């Protein structure tokens, strides 16, 4: 049987908020079966819980933010969400003492390491997957994204289109058959990126106050400004794919199907996920309860193998 997963023990870390620039404390706590991923604002009295849910994604400007009906928010959840997807973690309490998850190094890599350090616990009930049954597509001008049936796990086909000298030298198209180990080794270290020309405006809007060359790839009009350069030759499209994995895991379940997108971002990813969940004929919930069943997605293991 393919079982639900949580952590074996509590994990604590600190980091900087991407938009606030403030220190943020982060704690992962194991959760019972069928809890889902629950974010908790511990700086509020009483504490406020926000369950990872496509319907609670109410802000997608520069990040994915969960916002409840009272306006309480937790921002920048997408990189952590991608790490959770790669490890197949179904149930977890994520506690933060600020309105956002710390950005760490701008990728999913530190979150994978932290989660692994807590150990992965397989639980008593079967893991539930969302299987795509028919094509669903959303568009916004020339940008679009779609789901389609695919019987061999989760395939992603993503293309970006940035006009810039650095991007012109890169492959801006990526096809990726999702597995946890491949994600950890080939995708997870891809960092968020931005342009110097936008930073002054962002700061005027109280955004990206914690952004730096330590947690983002920054470009001027001609080149990458980070001394160490890029982590992957195609780091930009890989980060967009990382974002999409995190955004789509807002349904609290791994998806079995094909995701294809052109110039997508947080808003379109969420729009597609909402469109899917709103159409009961487009998907079904499946489990693999046979004793010898193999998971259609190979999740990253529990050994600390990341360098």
Swiss-Prot record:
Q: What Pfam families does this protein's entry cite?
A: LpxC
GO biological process annotations for this chain's record? lipid A biosynthetic process
Keyword terms of this UniProt record: Hydrolase, Lipid A biosynthesis, Lipid biosynthesis, Lipid metabolism, Metal-binding, Zinc
Q: Which cofactor does it need?
A: Zn(2+)
- Entry binding sites for Zn(2+): 79, 239, 243
Gene Ontology CC terms, in alphabetical order: membrane
**Protein's pathway:** Glycolipid biosynthesis; lipid IV(A) biosynthesis; lipid IV(A) from (3R)-3-hydroxytetradecanoyl-[acyl-carrier-protein] and UDP-N-acetyl-alpha-D-glucosamine: step 2/6
Q: Which InterPro entries match?
A: Ribosomal_Su5_D2-typ_SF, UDP-acyl_GlcNac_deAcase, UDP-acyl_GlcNac_deAcase_C, UDP-acyl_N-AcGlcN_deAcase_N
| EC number(s) from the headed UniProt entry | 3.5.1.108
In the UniProt record, does the keyword tRNA-binding occur?
A: no
Task: Name the catalytic site residues.
Answer: 266
- Its top-level enzyme class, in one word, is hydrolase
Q: Into which family does the record put it? A: Belongs to the LpxC family.
As for what it does, the entry says:
Catalyzes the hydrolysis of UDP-3-O-myristoyl-N-acetylglucosamine to form UDP-3-O-myristoylglucosamine and acetate, the committed step in lipid A biosynthesis.
Q: What is this protein called?
A: UDP-3-O-acyl-N-acetylglucosamine deacetylase
Organism this protein belongs to: Tolumonas auensis (strain DSM 9187 / NBRC 110442 / TA 4)
Q: Gene of origin?
A: lpxC
């Amino acid at each position: 049987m393919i079982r639900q997963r949580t952590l074996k023990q509590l994990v604590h870390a600190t980091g900087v908020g991407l938009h606030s620039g403030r220190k943020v404390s982060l704690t992962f706590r194991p959760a019972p079966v069928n809890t889902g991923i629950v974010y908790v604002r511990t700086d509020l009295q009483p504490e406020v819980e926000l369950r990872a849910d496509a319907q609670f994604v109410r802000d997608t400007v520069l990040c994915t933010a969960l916002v409840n009906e009272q306006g309480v928010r937790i921002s920048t959840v997408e990189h952590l969400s991608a790490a959770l997807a790669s490890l197949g973690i179904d149930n977890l309490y994520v506690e933060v003492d600020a309105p956002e998850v710390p950005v760490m190094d701008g990728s999913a890599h530190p979150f994978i390491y932290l989660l692994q350090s807590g150990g992965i616990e397989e639980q008593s009930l079967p893991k539930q997957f969302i299987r795509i049954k028919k094509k669903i597509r959303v568009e916004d001008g020339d940008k679009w994204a779609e789901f389609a049936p695919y019987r061999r796990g989760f395939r992603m086909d993503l293309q970006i289109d940035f006009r810039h000298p650095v991007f012109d030298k890169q492959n801006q198209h990526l096809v990726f058959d999702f597995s946890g180990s491949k994600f950890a080794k080939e995708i997870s270290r891809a960092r968020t990126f931005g342009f110097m020309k936008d930073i002054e405006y962002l700061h005027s809007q109280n955004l990206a106050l914690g952004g730096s060359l330590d947690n983002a790839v920054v470009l001027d009009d001609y080149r990458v400004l980070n001394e160490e350069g890029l982590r992957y030759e195609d780091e930009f499209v890989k980060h967009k794919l990382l974002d999409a994995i995190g955004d789509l895991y807002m349904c609290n379940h791994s998806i079995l199907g094909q995701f294809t997108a052109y110039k997508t971002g947080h808003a379109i990813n969420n729009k597609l996920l909402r469109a899917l969940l709103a159409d009961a004929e487009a998907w079904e919930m499946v489990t693999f309860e046979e004793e010898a069943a193999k998971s259609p997605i190979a999740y990253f293991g529990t050994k600390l193998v990341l360098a």
